[in-house]
From Swiss-Prot:
UniProt source species: Bos taurus (Bovine)
GO molecular function: double-stranded DNA binding; heparin binding; nucleosomal DNA binding; structural constituent of chromatin
Domain H15: 39-112
Name of the protein described by the UniProt record: Histone H1.1
Modified residues (Citrulline): R57
Gene expressing this chain: H1-1
Biased segments, Low complexity type: 119-149
Annotated positions of the N6-acetyllysine modification: K17, K78, K93, K125
Localization: Nucleus; Chromosome
GO cellular component: cell surface; euchromatin; nucleoplasm; nucleosome; nucleus; vesicle
Amino acid sequence: MSEVALPAPAASTSPEKPSAGKKAKKPAKAAAAAKKKPAGPSVSELIVQAVSSSKERSGVSLAALKKALAAAGYDVEKNNSRIKLGLKSLVGKGTLVQTKGTGASGSFKLNKKVASVDAKPTATKVATKTKVTSASKKPKKASGAAAAKKSVKTPKKARKSVLTKKSSKSPKKPKAVKPKKVAKSPAKAKAVKPKGAKVKVTKPKTAAKPKKAAPKKK
């Protein structure tokens, strides 16, 4: 009898399952990392705020600090070790001064020198920003004012040139008129003198008339 070929077994889908498992693990790690990162200010910042808000001259005790942190919504019971580490680091940096006790136990105050140094750079930054903004604004106004002054000065120069032209033209007219009048007056005087001379010449003719009556004798 002839042998019948059996159908090949279907390919198993088992290798795909581990990949899905790996993909599922990655979001779990991301969620854990998101949980580890606390939202809001750090423990040291909360401690500094609590110490600065207190009005006690001798300093704030650890119990008072925990109460202030709990009132701010911080979980004191779970983060007790973090509070102690934050206090030690702040004392080591010099931001806090330990007035009583040793380590994390005792009372703490803000270091005034460090607080003043921290406040000065912020004030200087604000002052420099205001100076830069004012300096950037002033040149624009000055340039506009300078342009306006130049535009105002140019017509003055034009007016001055017009006035100088008018003043230079006006004296020429009387100078041209005066010599003409002076020239006419001597001409009239010269014309009068020869008339008088003609009268003197005609006088001897009247003296010769009696000679005609002399030769008549009876």
